[in-house]
Curated annotation (Swiss-Prot):
Function: Oxygenase that can act as both a histone lysine demethylase and a ribosomal histidine hydroxylase. Specifically demethylates 'Lys-4' (H3K4me) and 'Lys-36' (H3K36me) of histone H3, thereby playing a central role in histone code. Preferentially demethylates trimethylated H3 'Lys-4' (H3K4me3) and monomethylated H3 'Lys-4' (H3K4me1) residues, while it has weaker activity for dimethylated H3 'Lys-36' (H3K36me2). Acts as a regulator of osteoblast differentiation via its interaction with SP7/OSX by demethylating H3K4me and H3K36me, thereby inhibiting SP7/OSX-mediated promoter activation.
A Pfam family assignment: JmjC_2
Disulfide bonds: none
Subunit: Interacts with SP7/OSX; the interaction is direct. Interacts with MYC. Interacts with PHF19; leading to its recruitment to H3K36me3 sites.
Keywords, sorted A to Z: Acetylation, Chromatin regulator, Dioxygenase, Iron, Metal-binding, Nucleus, Oxidoreductase, Phosphoprotein, Repressor, Transcription, Transcription regulation
Reaction(s) this enzyme catalyzes, per UniProt: N(6),N(6)-dimethyl-L-lysyl(36)-[histone H3] + 2 2-oxoglutarate + 2 O2 = L-lysyl(36)-[histone H3] + 2 formaldehyde + 2 succinate + 2 CO2; N(6)-methyl-L-lysyl-[protein] + 2-oxoglutarate + O2 = L-lysyl-[protein] + formaldehyde + succinate + CO2; L-histidyl-[protein] + 2-oxoglutarate + O2 = (3S)-3-hydroxy-L-histidyl-[protein] + succinate + CO2
Any GO BP annotation: regulation of DNA repair
Region span, Disordered: 1-99
Name of the featured protein: Ribosomal oxygenase 1
Gene: RIOX1
Comp. bias regions, Low complexity: 1-11
Length: 667
């Protein structure tokens, strides 16, 4: 496979060279084992035994726990976080092929506090459970907040059913507050920044110090494990719903609405003032970074002039009724970058975003569905949303986005609601949606997207051609010739034939297809998809600890005409682990091993070519140990290499590239 062969684009002995752009999947290289099978088994046993010995020598770290967040709800009907009760469902968990109802959560003031399993204080107000019949099979779950407000969808009156529930729980947050540093705006391709609070982006706006977003970013800065940071941020994003409940019951199945009654929940993430600053200070181009569109009389119009989107042009289009869509705001906003860079590890798939600003009394886009899982974060103003189920089974979990629909193409919405600041709306791929501003109020929202073409079908699409190729090489049954007369009974014109030869032919195909699983290079294709994810990923954002203990925090500087504090070196006694969990992947290509990494990625999608280091065979087991032992520390002298030189060479190369951190600062 030409695009994956070892060539001059590799990194050799620490020298960085660009690799050519990868080619589409082809045959033999991905199926090649890195070593003979028996040796690989022995090496894996060796690595496993070393890891077991390492764990026996050290105390169990809290970061080594499974990254999944423990749910506060067991089975349906148990109380959710914040006193919200989940509506019981006698049918149990829905299979993937069926779509359940819409779920709505009303976040109480208690649940709006920063949540933690510690320091729980019982509140006085009992929770309530409501069932609303605004659409067929629609389900609305509401907490005890007296200010709750539901938008009716011109249907029969809702039925309200009182239900007893456990008392709401209040979370003590004072212990989680800590000071953070604000980052200055940075260019799209730089060294990783520190995780900190919301950024003003040079707009001069006053950001609230004690906002929910500020508090969660401060909390993340204190969590040493990147996988736990990702889990915690996602828990905050969908709070008060437990992540376990969301993934088991709702992910890829149902639309979800979370009401928080807290307009400050996302404050500091993005704003119209930040957008104005970006238009003034950045090279924003119409069509590439910014779209201007409007939906009038059942038709969508895109009114992008050529060239740069200067404030005069952009705001004139806005005044003319156009919605402004900022593509890839993470390239311009440090806070959005921080937000997505942490969350991408939760999804195991690229996390992207767009920002939409819609003027009052207007609609920017026609009804349509997308090919991504969408999380809508309402930042400013209000917007009326209508969400519809997939019309036919082929649209469920759609693989591609739809064309624009007319109103006549739509049925009754499964959800109709007005989003206000702090609210969250989730809907799966294939759910049709449209949104409009009313009542003289503008709207600003950010859509977080993920899971584009990340399906079993996409995986098998890469596996099966390689499996057929391997089967033909290794099994003579796949090389036997077709019957000379097969065209006499096979094909569409013979589809109704009862010829026994046709039955035998179909049975032979089924037998051969069943045997393909034995030849499928599943691990090799998984590595290739992981490599693609590494290239798709945003560069990591570092905590204060990660920066201080990595090459990014070394005190080397220019002073008095010469560099000072040069010479810090790793030794065999230095304890190290990977900088973060998802920043690197070891991949076999063309009989060689390469470590692909994210720390030099750009905030602009695929602006940089994939970056990698070549790992030599004598260092392969040590590299695997480092990748698999995170977040536990490993002594450089305990790395499974034949020589001390190989141990120090590997550790130094990784440290100098910003891929390792040390237990103690180097001096």
């Amino acid at each position: 496979m030409d695009g994956l062969r070892a060539s001059a684009g590799l990194l050799r002995r620490g020298r960085l060279r660009r690799r050519r752009q990868q080619q589409p999947h082809s045959g033999s290289v991905l199926a090649l084992p890195l070593r003979p099978r028996k040796i690989r088994r022995q090496l894996r046993r060796s690595v496993s035994s070393r890891m077991a010995a390492l764990r026996a020598q050290t105390l169990q770290s809290e970061d080594s726990e499974d990254s999944r967040v423990e749910s506060t709800v067991g089975e349906p009907g148990d109380p959710l976080a914040g006193g919200t009760a989940a509506l019981s469902d006698a049918t149990g968990r829905e299979p993937h092929g069926q779509l359940g109802p819409v779920e709505l959560l009303e976040a109480s003031p208690a649940s709006r506090s920063l949540q933690t399993p510690r320091a729980l204080v019982e509140a006085q107000t009992p929770a309530a459970r409501l069932v609303e019949a605004q659409t067929p099979a629609a389900r609305l779950v509401e907490a005890h907040t007296p200010a709750a407000r539901l938008v009716e969808a011109h249907t029969p009156p809702a039925r309200l059913v009182e239900a007893s529930a456990l008392p709401a729980r209040l979370v003590e947050t004072s212990a989680l507050l800590c000071s953070t540093q604000h980052l200055a705006a940075v260019p799209p391709s730089v060294a990783p920044a520190m995780l900190s609070g919301p950024q003003g982006e040079s707009t001069g706006e006053e950001l609230p110090w004690d906002s929910p977003l500020q508090r969660i970013l401060a909390e993340l800065n204190r969590i040493p494990s990147s996988r736990r940071r990702a889990a915690r941020l996602f828990e905050w994003l969908i709070s008060p719903m437990p992540p376990d409940h969301f993934y088991r019951r709702l992910w890829e199945r149902e639309a979800v609405l979370v009401r928080r009654q807290d307009h400050s929940y996302y404050q500091g993430l993005f704003s119209t003032a930040v957008l104005d600053s970006i238009l003034r200070n950045e090279e924003v181009q119409f069509g590439q970074h910014l779209d201007a569109a409007r939906y009038i009389n059942g038709r969508r119009e895109t009114l992008n002039p050529p060239g740069r989107a200067l404030p005069a042009a952009a705001w004139s289009l806005y005044r003319a009724g156009c919605s402004l869509r900022l593509l890839c705001p993470q390239a311009f906003s440090t806070t959005v970058w921080q937000f997505l860079a942490v969350l991408q590890e939760q999804f195991g798939s690229m996390a992207g975003s767009n920002v939409y600003l819609t003027p009052p009394n207007s609609q920017g886009f026609a009804p349509h569905y997308d090919d991504i899982e969408a999380f809508v974060l309402q930042l400013e103003g209000r917007k009326l949303w209508r969400v519809y189920r997939p019309r036919v089974p082929t649209e469920e979990l759609a693989l591609t986005s739809s064309p624009n629909f007319s109103q006549d193409d739509l049925g009754e919405p499964v959800l109709q609601t007005v989003l206000e600041p702090g609210d969250l709306l989730y809907f799966p791929r294939g759910f049709i949606h449209q949104a409009e501003c009313q009542d003289g109020v503008h709207s600003l929202h950010l859509t977080l997207s993920t899971f584009q073409r990340n399906t079993w079908g996409d995986f098998l699409e890469a596996v099966l051609p390689l499996a057929v190729q391997a089967a033909m090489e290794e099994n003579v049954e796949f090389r036997r010739g077709l019957p000379r007369d097969f065209m006499d009974y096979m094909g569409a014109q013979h589809s109704d034939s009862k010829d026994p030869r046709r039955t035998a032919f179909m049975e032979k195909v089924r037998v051969l297809v069943a045997r393909l699983g034995h030849f499928a290079p599943v691990d090799a294709v998984a590595d290739q998809r992981a490599k693609d994810f590494i290239h798709d990923s945003l560069p990591p954002v570092l905590t204060d600890r990660e920066r201080a203990l990595s090459v990014y925090g070394l005190p080397i500087r220019w002073e008095a005409g010469e560099p000072v504090n040069v010479g810090a070196q790793l030794t065999t006694e230095t304890e190290v682990h990977m900088l973060q969990d998802g920043i690197a992947r070891l991949v076999g290509e063309g009989g060689h091993l390469f470590l692909y990494y994210t720390v030099e990625n750009s905030r602009v999608y695929h602006l940089e070519e994939p970056k990698c280091l070549e790992i030599y065979p004598q260092q392969a087991d040590a590299m695997e140990l480092l990748l698999r032992s995170y977040p536990e520390f490993v002594r450089v002298g305990d790395l499974p290499c034949d020589t001390v030189e190989d141990q120090l060479s590997l550790a130094t190369m990784l440290y100098d590239k910003g891929l390792l951190l040390t237990k103690m600062p180097l001096t």
